[in-house]
């Protein structure tokens, strides 16, 4: 699919998007209250930091990408730190494809919560088809936030290393500061690499395009397409990666989430079967 067609397809003014399940992913951010989950999401989506604290019940965002000839959808679920509904927490984990677990370096209780969350993710994901706790493959990063408050640290490095383990392909650790925007880009790049997703999904590796700019961008892409056909070059835009934040995104229904789990599990099983097929 050419860039012009992709950009037009990505625009929310068009009819319902049709993106294959293999290109749809959900990033789930988990952790205690007041550890900076929403601040990390804000940095990811807008690059901004909001100093005022507003308790999160559950925030849902959706972003579309045009990357190397394909369209991707990334849902971002910013969960509550209070988890008043255990069943919803479990559903959030089941629908998650990549996870960010956040604790505050100056709050030991929040670190202990991340310990519990990591185990809960492994336990929950092992319930899916053909999974055991030993072979669960869940892209996951643990973030020690508020690195700007290191003087008040309550968590020892050796404890963190013990939690993360010795397999960087399964779990990685980053000390970050959402306030100072420190190490966030590296963290997102590592997470997407772990999940075998395009590196361009990282905020610093694609052009952020507003919904209002869609039509202009579409016309520009069409113009570049004509120039390429004429052999005049297109200014290089045909190779760019773009990201569009969907306005007014709503959390899918429970039924839709269950169908999502079923479809993703089916896609994963088919991929595993292909890997096992060897022609000799």
From Swiss-Prot:
Keywords: Cell membrane, Cytoplasm, GTP-binding, Lipoprotein, Membrane, Methylation, Nucleotide-binding, Nucleus, Prenylation, S-nitrosylation. A motif (Effector region) lies at residues 53-61. A lipid is attached at residue 277 (S-farnesyl cysteine). InterPro entries: P-loop_NTPase (IPR027417), Small_GTP-bd (IPR005225), Small_GTPase (IPR001806), Small_GTPase_RasD (IPR052236). Gene3D superfamilies: P-loop containing nucleotide triphosphate hydrolases (3.40.50.300). The modification S-nitrosocysteine is found at residue 11. It is a lipid-anchor. PROSITE patterns: RAS. GTP binds at residues 31-38, 78-82, 145-148. PANTHER family: DEXAMETHASONE-INDUCED RAS-RELATED PROTEIN 1, MIP08469P. Forms a ternary complex with CAPON and NOS1. Component of a complex, at least composed of APBB1, RASD1/DEXRAS1 and APP. Interacts with APBB1/FE65. Forms. Belongs to the small GTPase superfamily. RasD family. This is Dexamethasone-induced Ras-related protein 1. It comes from Rattus norvegicus (Rat). The gene is Rasd1.
